Amino acid sequence: MAKRVAAIVKLQVPAGKATPAPPVGPALGQHGVNIMAFVKEYNERTAAQAGLIIPVEITVYEDRSFTFVTKTPPAAVLLKKAAGLETASGEPNKKKVAKLPRSKVKEIAELKMPDLNAASIEAAMRMIEGTARSMGIDIVEG
């Protein structure tokens, strides 16, 4: 017989730097999960992606055990890293903060493809370009 799911918790945590402090502790503590076990396993799995924020979906079962799935980093985080930005533009329509070649957008789209609701790489690229536009990043040919 399969375990019964008690809750699904979604968090965005820096790779390799999860701690029992907020937001991880309170989110898992209220479901009775062993927080240190999650933190240790998450940090081991994401150590190679240091510096990125990794979304994680934690499934908590009624017997207080858990499983989790890590997703790809948010498009905005990948775009900021590719453009070398600390923060995006506060006024994306007026103030452009960077230019990014279409080849970089394609790389990001290929990385994000498993988590995007897109049928083709071109559709995924359009989604990433839309995110870039809303951040004040211009997409240039190249």
UniProtKB/Swiss-Prot annotation:
Keywords (A to Z) from UniProt: Methylation, Ribonucleoprotein, Ribosomal protein, RNA-binding, rRNA-binding
Q: Which GO terms describe its cellular component?
A: cytosolic large ribosomal subunit
Q: Which InterPro entries match?
A: Ribosomal_uL11 (IPR000911), Ribosomal_uL11_bac-typ (IPR006519), Ribosomal_uL11_C (IPR020783), Ribosomal_uL11_C_sf (IPR036769), Ribosomal_uL11_CS (IPR020785), Ribosomal_uL11_N (IPR020784), Ribosomal_uL11_N_sf (IPR036796)
PTM (free text): One or more lysine residues are methylated.
Work out whether the entry's keyword set contains rRNA-binding: yes
Q: Which GO terms are recorded in the biological process aspect for this UniProt protein?
A: translation
Assembly description: Part of the ribosomal stalk of the 50S ribosomal subunit. Interacts with L10 and the large rRNA to form the base of the stalk. L10 forms an elongated spine to which L12 dimers bind in a sequential fashion forming a multimeric L10(L12)X complex.
Homology family: Belongs to the universal ribosomal protein uL11 family.
Function, in words: Forms part of the ribosomal stalk which helps the ribosome interact with GTP-bound translation factors.
Protein name, per record: Large ribosomal subunit protein uL11
| Species assigned in the record | Pelotomaculum thermopropionicum (strain DSM 13744 / JCM 10971 / SI)
